[in-house]
From Swiss-Prot:
Belongs to the YdjC deacetylase family. It is an enzyme of class 3 (hydrolase). Its EC number is 3.5.1.-. This is Carbohydrate deacetylase. Keywords: Carbohydrate metabolism, Hydrolase, Magnesium, Metal-binding. Its cofactor is Mg(2+). The active site is at 13 (proton acceptor). It comes from Danio rerio (Zebrafish). GO terms for biological process: carbohydrate metabolic process. Residues 262-281 are annotated as: Disordered. Probably catalyzes the deacetylation of acetylated carbohydrates an important step in the degradation of oligosaccharides. InterPro entries: Glyco_hydro/deAcase_b/a-brl, YdjC-like. The gene is ydjc.
Length: 313
């Protein structure tokens, strides 16, 4: 078999969110559309997801959640991580509280450690990789605590959400372009922190420009071709190697973040406060159908793109 040009990890995020999402992720995995999953251990259907992962031998990591729903740690009552109702502050609320200087990093650390331990209880082994729900793991101050937790537990892979060519994706609405630009800035500033703690990541990250209705064969082609063009010249790749020349003779490694599934029903799913609009959208089904489309799978084969998982690294 010829050497692949790209070793692509296609990660289905938010495993555990609800049973319909879980089933959609499993169906996508069994059809060859994804090769890896990321578990929300504080989600209401996390146990259901864990049982499915073991049944179907799904490579699985931890999608650490500090922004949605209820905490795992039982010692966070009155915590700066939580609002007056006892829930996390939300995607933007978490960032606002962090930037105001009100978050205690000791509480962030306690919750991250509790989630790793819950993952082990559910799955029976440590996560093959660990990232952050809504990209919280690359935020200032959080990144240092996150990296230390991974180092302490021996978790060696994470996600660095910097997507080649993203700045040219003018089809994205302005609010998403603004959010994505900040995510990339935070991610770039996390590189040295992760590197210093012995944490690795794929050479290329994809997924910010291909979410929901923006996922289609032409858009996946564009994103993957941008990753190939980026190749070994990427500063993220060179950061991870003391011998950059050797990278010329190995495949590019990449992660594609995806969110397939069957849409959540009202009042079903979530992380303790019900499902959000994102989970109830038909965009989930659109991603599922696109990822398992024979045209997409054939494109991978034609381009020398081999689907794999973090554990294969």
């Amino acid at each position: 078999m010829p050497q692949p040009k790209v070793k692509l990890v296609v990660t289905g995020d938010d495993f555990g969110y609800c049973e319909r999402r879980n089933q959609g992720i499993v169906d996508c995995f069994r059809a060859g559309g994804i090769s890896n999953v990321s578990l929300l251990v504080n989600a209401v259907s996390a146990k259901h997801a864990a049982d499915l992962a073991k049944r179907y031998h799904m490579p699985i990591g931890l999608h650490a959640n500090l922004s949605e729903g209820l905490p795992v740690s039982q010692e966070l009552k009155g915590s700066t991580l939580l609002n007056k109702d006892g829930f996390f502050h939300g995607k933007m609320g978490f960032r606002e509280v962090l930037h105001s200087g009100q978050l205690k990093m000791s509480e962030v650390e306690a919750e991250l450690r509790a989630q790793v331990n819950r993952f082990f209880e559910l799955i029976g082994h440590m996560p093959y990789h660990m990232d952050g729900h809504q990209h919280v793991h690359v935020l200032p101050d959080v990144r240092e605590v996150f990296a230390q937790v991974l180092s302490d537990f021996g978790i060696t892979y994470t996600r660095v959400p910097i997507e080649p060519g993203l700045r040219f994706c003018n089809f994205l609405p302005s609010h998403l372009r603004e959010f994505n630009a900040q995510v990339e800035k935070d991610a770039l500033e996390s590189v040295e922190v992760f590197h210093r703690n012995g944490i690795r990541w794929p050479d290329v990250y994809l997924g910010l420009s291909t979410m929901g209705k923006n996922m289609c064969l032409s858009n996946l082609k564009r994103a993957l071709e941008a990753s190939l063009d980026d190749g070994v010249s990427s500063p993220l790749i060179l950061t991870q190697s003391n011998n950059a020349a050797s990278n010329c003779y190995r495949p590019v490694t990449a992660e594609l973040m995806v969110h397939p599934g069957y849409p959540s029903q009202p009042q079903q799913g979530g992380c303790g406060e019900g499902p959000d609009d994102f989970s109830q959208s038909t965009d989930r089904l659109h991603e599922l159908n696109t990822l398992r489309d024979p045209m997409v799978l054939n494109f991978y084969r034609q381009q020398g793109i081999h689907l794999c998982a973090f554990k294969d690294f």
